[in-house]
């Protein structure tokens, strides 16, 4: 993961947070252990940082004079077995949950933090999300600028095997599967879903 965070002139310390209160969870359960190899840069200069000893989801980064942005680089280690947590990535499918693989600056309402998301998918994969303004260049996908709150509420489903049904009313059903034969749906089931949209 690579994330660029602008900094105001004169900033000497930037605190970045990994979300701990996640949509659909009833407690502070952000997957901190899945964030590894965390590094920060201003240009080519590697920056010093430390994790807060009390607020463990906070990372304090020392910002050099004149820096206009800080680049965070890290790896999100998705669970490989169900005993490690929900499996969200396989060789054929992806459920990209932004809140588990992004940081945000402390001291701001998340609905006011502007972001421009970009993802590079494996060749031939198709993405689906509630984000607006999708454009593709090869296997690189970019969406229109949005706020961090909307980003977190807009996971991406993508996969090698993908199918989409128009349910009417500007509503689509997007399906990804491990195998192409698993993409099928009975016409009567699609009709029921279309009826729900009409209701």
Regions found by a protein language model. Give the residues of each.
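Short linear S-[DN]-x-LW-Φ motif typified by the pepsin-like aspartic protease active-site region
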Residues: 16, 26-27
């Amino acid at each position: 993961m690579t994330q660029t965070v602008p900094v105001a002139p004169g900033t000497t310390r930037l605190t970045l947070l990994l979300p701990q209160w996640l949509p659909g969870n009833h407690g502070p359960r952000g997957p901190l252990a899945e964030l590894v190899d965390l590094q920060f840069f201003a240009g080519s200069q590697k920056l010093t940082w430390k994790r807060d000893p009390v607020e463990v989801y906070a990372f304090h980064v020392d910002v050099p004079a004149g820096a206009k942005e800080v680049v965070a680089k890290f790896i999100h280690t998705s669970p490989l077995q169900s005993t490690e947590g929900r499996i969200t990535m396989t060789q054929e499918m992806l459920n990209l949950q932004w809140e588990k693989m992004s940081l945000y600056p402390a001291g701001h309402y998340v609905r006011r933090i502007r972001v421009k998301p970009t993802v590079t998918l494996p060749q031939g994969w198709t993405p689906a999300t509630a984000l607006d303004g999708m454009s593709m260049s090869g296997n690189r996908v970019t969406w229109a600028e949005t706020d961090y709150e909307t980003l977190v509420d807009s996971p991406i489903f993508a996969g090698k095997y993908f199918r989409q049904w128009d349910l009417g009313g500007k509503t689509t059903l997007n399906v990804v599967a491990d195998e192409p034969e698993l993409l099928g749906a009975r016409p009567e089931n699609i009709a029921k879903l279309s009826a729900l949209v009409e209701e």
